[in-house]
Amino acid sequence: MSVTVKMLVDKVKLDVIYGDDDLLSKEITTSDISRPGLEMTGYFDYYSPERLQLLGMKEWSYLTKMTSHNRRHVLREMIKPETPAIIVARNLAIPEEMISAAKEKGIAILQSHVPTSRLSGEMSWYLDSCLAERTSVHGVLMDIYGMGVLIQGDSGIGKSETGLELVKRGHRLVADDRVDVFAKDEETLWGEPAEILRHLLEIRGVGIIDVMSLYGASAVKDSSQVQLAIYLENYESGKVFDRLGNGNEELELSGVKIPRLRIPVQTGRNMSVVIEAAAMNYRAKQMGFDATKTFEERLTQLITKNEGNQ
């Protein structure tokens, strides 16, 4: 997904001090944001001009203490044609030399009232989400009790129907059929729908339904962290499934591993309730409440007691 300066302006609510439509259409190619420190002293070795340049109180204060000549020299070196934009936080006054250099190099100048660290965090979060490499997987992504659950399985096994039942039970649909996943960092996986499929659910025999229109805004979500994967598969006699919940199967997507449960589909089983329980049980484990561990401790105590009575 490509991101332009205009998209960043709209998302983070920045004020455009200088820049027309052409300058705002410039593409941002990296989520890294630079806060020029040594560059202010004239040291430009290893400088990355392709990054957004963010100036806060420290950078601004140093600039204002320079002579006009030195300020003009530093800003002309710092602002390059490949720089997407220069951003000034805290509504600090824009030096004339900065506007002059931006006009010369064709760079937009943006401003925000937000403190520098918070502004940097907001922009990084947005750019990381947009510029991260996507992987498309087949399945249904649901938000169940605030936790992202990816439901997978063979075609026709009932993933979408299960998703619809979960929506009726008060949970939220994120994506159906195609889920675009990306790593926010080394340990966090996020998922979102393809734009053409947003809020839509395909039910065999019924067709495509608009969940937003039928069930309201509370039934959908634009994106979600993916924390648990559930694979639905047909029950076969003799096939071994985890009965205690102490399995450690994982699914790796975009370099991030998440736990995966395999749940057998059988006539008469209410899959939405089973998946709901699986999500709650996983969350309980994350909070330190492990029913499997409790059972094993009770079993050990019982065995020890029986051995003592012999």
Swiss-Prot record:
Database matches in InterPro entries: HPr(Ser)_kin/Pase, Hpr_kin/Pase_C, Hpr_kin/Pase_Hpr_N, P-loop_NTPase, Ser_kin/Pase_Hpr-like_N_sf
Group of enzyme by EC: transferase
Binding site for ATP: 153-160
Catalytic reaction list: [HPr protein]-L-serine + ATP = [HPr protein]-O-phospho-L-serine + ADP + H(+); [HPr protein]-O-phospho-L-serine + phosphate + H(+) = [HPr protein]-L-serine + diphosphate
Activity regulation behaviour: Kinase activity is inhibited by inorganic phosphate (Pi). In contrast to many other bacteria, neither kinase activity nor phosphorylase activity is affected by fructose 1,6-bisphosphate (FBP).
Keyword annotations: ATP-binding, Carbohydrate metabolism, Kinase, Magnesium, Metal-binding, Multifunctional enzyme, Nucleotide-binding, Serine/threonine-protein kinase, Transferase
MF terms in GO: ATP binding; magnesium ion binding; phosphorelay sensor kinase activity; protein serine/threonine kinase activity; protein serine/threonine/tyrosine kinase activity
Positions of the UniProt region annotated as Important for the catalytic mechanism of dephosphorylation: 264-269
Binding site for Mg(2+): 160, 202
Cofactor: Mg(2+); Mn(2+)
Induction: Constitutively expressed. Transcription of S.bovis hprK is not significantly altered by growth rate or energy source.
Gene Ontology biological process terms, A to Z: regulation of carbohydrate metabolic process
Enzyme Commission number(s) of this protein: 2.7.11.-, 2.7.4.-
Region ranges (Important for the catalytic mechanism of both phosphorylation and dephosphorylation): 201-210
Taxonomic superkingdom: Bacteria
Activity profile over pH: Optimum pH is 7.0 for both kinase and phosphorylase reactions. Activity decreases to less than 10% of the maximal activity at pH 5.5.
Protein family membership: Belongs to the HPrK/P family.
Miscellaneous: Both phosphorylation and phosphorolysis are carried out by the same active site and suggest a common mechanism for both reactions.
Record text about domains: The Walker A ATP-binding motif also binds Pi and PPi.
Job description of the protein: Catalyzes the ATP- as well as probably the pyrophosphate-dependent phosphorylation of 'Ser-46' in HPr, a phosphocarrier protein of the phosphoenolpyruvate-dependent sugar phosphotransferase system (PTS). HprK/P also catalyzes the pyrophosphate-producing, inorganic phosphate-dependent dephosphorylation (phosphorolysis) of seryl-phosphorylated HPr (P-Ser-HPr).
Oligomer and partners: Homohexamer.
Name recorded for this polypeptide: HPr kinase/phosphorylase
Gene: hprK
